[in-house]
């Protein structure tokens, strides 16, 4: 992994030698989540119940779907959905739902060979979403609605909001 920064998929692939053949979590640091039960613990409960890949999601406004990876999913239980597809930053008219993937994932090691075969996409980067789109076709995959307040710290306003909320 001596290549320059090549996308989130590449970053995950670079960790393969540390992860081996075990399930693992991906936590995007620009998504700050304030919750009574940590977001990852919410996902672990679903995973520990025998489910495969688990993505954390929250509903976003229809006009905001174009800023996120959006899951196409079927409701299984309250707050839990089986993923049937993923769309990266769709237009509001093309979005299959309003459930945005919010930077907390539990993935299986089956993602690694898929990432190795993933052609660089937008900005010539290996996109994790492209590999996830294939993985959800091959393995049981679920979206768990995260109970908590999310702040997009990758956005200046979101960063300021998180700073103020956590400082009070």
Q: What are these model-predicted stretches?
A:
Residues 25, 44-48, 77-168:
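Catalytic-core segments of class I nucleotidyltransferases/pyrophosphorylases
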Residues 2-73, 109, 116-118:
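Conserved beta-loop-beta/alpha segment of the NTase-like Rossmann-fold superfamily
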């Amino acid at each position: 992994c001596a290549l320059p920064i090549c996308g989130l998929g590449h970053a995950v692939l670079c960790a393969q030698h540390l992860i081996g053949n075990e399930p693992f979590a991906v936590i995007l640091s620009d998504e700050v989540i304030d919750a009574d039960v940590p977001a990852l613990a919410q996902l672990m409960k679903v995973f520990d119940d025998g489910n495969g890949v688990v993505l954390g999601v929250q509903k976003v406004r229809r006009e905001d779907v174009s800023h996120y990876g959006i899951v196409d999913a079927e409701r299984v239980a309250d707050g839990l959905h089986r993923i049937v597809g993923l769309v990266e930053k769709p237009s509001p008219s093309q979005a299959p739902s309003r459930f945005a993937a919010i930077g907390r994932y539990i993935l299986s090691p089956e993602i690694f060979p898929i990432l190795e075969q993933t052609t660089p996409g937008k900005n010539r980067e290996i996109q994790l979403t492209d590999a996830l789109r294939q993985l959800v076709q091959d393995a049981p995959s679920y979206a768990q609605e995260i109970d908590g307040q999310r702040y997009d710290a990758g956005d200046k306003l979101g960063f300021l909001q998180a700073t103020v909320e956590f400082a009070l």
